[in-house]
């Protein structure tokens, strides 16, 4: 049992930036990319296992014909607000509809470990935005794992936030690949012909020489940590990005701290308005975007 090939399929803009989350790119682009991935996954390079974000369920119909254990999902939300699993283009999978894993590196380790029984070969596909792909990029660099990089490069900016991809995560050389025609009446049918389709192989860098690693180990204990800044720095890693509503309001406590007029802890009442201003109501993560 083992992974013979890893392919990362994602979107890029002209500045080599990924959409930070799935909701930061057009759902029509994801629909096209997932269909391309399903067609490419039929190549005879091992059993295909496609990892995608949970919030692409409505756009992942081409993948649902795969066996359940070969189409795992990752819930990439970093918010504490309740998920939207019923409505909207970016609704998530229902419970038990798909196998859930922690992240793409966890899926790779699960497939690559030794197990008793017949030896099976897998082709791992990672399809998504920066919140899904970047943790795998970091894992691949740490473990010196090479992978195929398949991207659709658009001419337009993302609907939401971009995440610039460091050069170490990009292939040094790329060639073009020809996508299969878009489905009839696709919203981006005219634009898809203007996009670039890049394919390359990301090769891990050479290991540091043993002498250099030894010197680093000697100097590391004597490095003084920098004083902490008084201003909190915003989280820039794509896996730590909350939704826009969460970023615009203070953290909501888990339990209400108000009491009723009778001070009955078993029957807390609703928060009272101060003047003409009502307290903020609870919200649901629901990314709104346009096709």
Swiss-Prot record:
<dbReference type="InterPro" id="IPR003485">
    <property type="entry name" value="Herpes_US2_varicellovirus"/>
</dbReference>
<keyword id="KW-0945">Host-virus interaction</keyword>
<keyword id="KW-1048">Host nucleus</keyword>
<protein>
    <recommendedName>
        <fullName>Protein US2</fullName>
    </recommendedName>
</protein>
<dbReference type="Pfam" id="PF02476">
    <property type="entry name" value="US2"/>
</dbReference>
<dbReference type="GO" id="GO:0042025">
    <property type="term" value="C:host cell nucleus"/>
</dbReference>
<comment type="similarity">
    <text>Belongs to the herpesviridae HHV-1 US2 protein family.</text>
</comment>
<comment type="function">
    <text>Plays a role in the activation of the host NF-kappa-B pathway by interacting with and thus activating the component MAP3K7.</text>
</comment>
<keyword id="KW-0946">Virion</keyword>
<keyword id="KW-1074">Activation of host NF-kappa-B by virus</keyword>
<dbReference type="GO" id="GO:0085033">
    <property type="term" value="P:symbiont-mediated activation of host NF-kappaB cascade"/>
</dbReference>
<feature type="region of interest" description="Disordered">
    <location>
        <begin position="223"/>
        <end position="281"/>
    </location>
</feature>
<keyword id="KW-1035">Host cytoplasm</keyword>
<dbReference type="GO" id="GO:0044423">
    <property type="term" value="C:virion component"/>
</dbReference>
<dbReference type="InterPro" id="IPR036179">
    <property type="entry name" value="Ig-like_dom_sf"/>
</dbReference>
<feature type="modified residue" description="N-acetylglycine; by host">
    <location>
        <position position="2"/>
    </location>
</feature>
<comment type="subunit">
    <text>Interacts with host KRT18. Interacts with host MAP3K7; this interaction induces host NF-kappa-B pathway.</text>
</comment>
<dbReference type="GO" id="GO:0044228">
    <property type="term" value="C:host cell surface"/>
</dbReference>
<keyword id="KW-0007">Acetylation</keyword>
<dbReference type="GO" id="GO:0030430">
    <property type="term" value="C:host cell cytoplasm"/>
</dbReference>
């Amino acid at each position: 049992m083992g992974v013979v090939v890893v392919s990362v399929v994602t979107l890029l803009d002209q500045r080599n930036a990924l959409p930070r989350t799935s909701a930061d790119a057009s759902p029509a682009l994801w629909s096209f990319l997932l269909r391309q991935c399903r067609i490419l996954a039929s190549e005879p390079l091992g059993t295909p296992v496609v990892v995608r974000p949970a919030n692409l369920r409505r756009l992942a119909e081409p993948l649902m014909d795969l066996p359940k254990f070969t189409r795992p999902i990752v819930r990439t939300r970093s918010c504490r607000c309740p998920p939207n699993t019923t409505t909207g283009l970016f609704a998530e999978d229902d419970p038990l509809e798909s196998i859930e894993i922690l992240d793409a590196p966890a899926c790779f380790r699960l497939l690559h470990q030794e197990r008793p029984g017949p030896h099976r070969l897998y082709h791992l596909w990672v399809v998504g935005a920066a919140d899904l792909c970047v943790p795998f990029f970091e894992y691949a660099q740490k473990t010196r794992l090479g992978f195929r990089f398949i991207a659709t490069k658009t001419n337009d900016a993302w609907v939401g936030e971009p995440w610039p991809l460091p050069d170490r995560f990009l292939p040094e050389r790329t060639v073009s690949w020809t996508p299969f025609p878009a489905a009839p009446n696709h919203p981006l049918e005219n634009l898809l012909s203007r996009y670039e389709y890049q394919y390359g192989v990301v090769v891990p860098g050479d290991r540091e020489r043993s002498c250099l690693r030894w010197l680093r180990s000697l100097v590391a204990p004597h490095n003084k940590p920098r004083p902490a800044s008084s201003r909190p720095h915003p989280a820039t890693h794509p896996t730590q990005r909350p939704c826009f509503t969460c970023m615009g309001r203070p953290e909501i406590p888990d339990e209400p701290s108000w009491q009723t007029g009778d001070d009955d802890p078993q029957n807390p009442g609703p928060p009272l308005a101060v003047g003409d201003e009502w307290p903020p109501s609870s919200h649901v993560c629901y990314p709104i975007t346009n096709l």
